[in-house]
């Protein structure tokens, strides 16, 4: 029995909807790429990657300072500092102990302590994330702690332990290395954030987590 023309049209319509939904999901799931590959504002962009090796045997923090020019930031840069231009500003991003201060500049934040181990050599990967509400990152894990500095908007992160929300001016979000996670931009404003992955230098900073499925806690 030949399928009717109407049934064929229904199949075509349903197939088109499925393709559109899959394409939409792929478009909303963001993978971080080098800033040299940037083609637009939205997305997750790797702005710098710095080898730090072993860290001091004390509580470790991420220090964020801004400067009027790149030259001024580079003049204040220490051995564990990185200068990036991101979100319209020149930043000196430094991994050091509590209370550390560079010369000059404007202190923006001190985030930590970061959960690190004394015997591990570390590298710092810095990123700029600009997500519209609803955009996500695929389930993944890191080989060291991740921290955000949220300039605008809101981000919800689900892990097996539950969820945490980062907002501009809100409490710090620090995630230890190892557990899987799934990130979603929430709220009503575009998320703009600086991101640090302080990872084991002998391992990739980020790996997919196909062995874990989020419960959708960030949709509630």
Residue map of PLM features:
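Bacterial N-terminal signal peptides that target proteins for export
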Residues: 2-13
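Bacterial N-terminal signal peptides
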Residues: 11-22
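Boundary at the C-terminal end of the N-terminal hydrophobic targeting segment
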Residues: 27-29
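Short acidic-glycine-tyrosine-enriched beta hairpin
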Residues: 36, 65-72, 160-180
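Ligand-binding loop in jelly-roll beta-barrel domains
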Residues: 85-90, 156, 176-204
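Glycine- and acidic-residue-biased ligand/ion/polar-headgroup-sensing regions
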Residues: 143-162
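Short, low-complexity, Pro/Ser/Thr/Gly-rich segments in the mature regions of secreted, periplasmic
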Residues: 206-220
């Amino acid at each position: 029995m030949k399928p009717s023309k109407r049934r064929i049209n229904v199949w075509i319509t349903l197939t088109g909807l499925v393709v559109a939904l899959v394409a939409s999901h792929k478009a909303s799931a963001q993978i971080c790429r080098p800033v040299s590959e940037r083609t637009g504002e939205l997305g997750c962009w790797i702005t710098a990657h710095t080898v730090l090796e072993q860290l001091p045997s004390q509580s470790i923090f991420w220090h964020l300072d801004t400067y009027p020019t790149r030259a001024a930031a580079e003049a204040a840069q220490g051995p564990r500092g990185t200068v990036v231009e991101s979100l319209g500003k020149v930043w000196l991003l430094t991994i050091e102990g509590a209370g550390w201060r560079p010369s000059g500049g404007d202190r923006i934040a001190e985030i930590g302590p970061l959960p690190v181990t004394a015997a591990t050599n570390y590298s710092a990967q810095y990123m700029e994330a600009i997500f519209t509400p609803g955009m996500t990152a695929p389930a993944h894990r890191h080989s060291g702690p991740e921290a955000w500095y949220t300039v605008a908007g809101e981000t919800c992160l689900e892990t097996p332990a539950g969820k945490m929300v980062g907002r501009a001016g809100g409490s710090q979000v620090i995630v230890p290395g190892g557990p899987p996670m799934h990130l979603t931009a929430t709220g009503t404003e575009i998320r703009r954030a600086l991101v640090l992955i302080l990872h084991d230098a002998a391992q990739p900073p980020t790996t997919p987590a196909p062995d874990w499925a989020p419960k959708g806690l960030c949709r509630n």
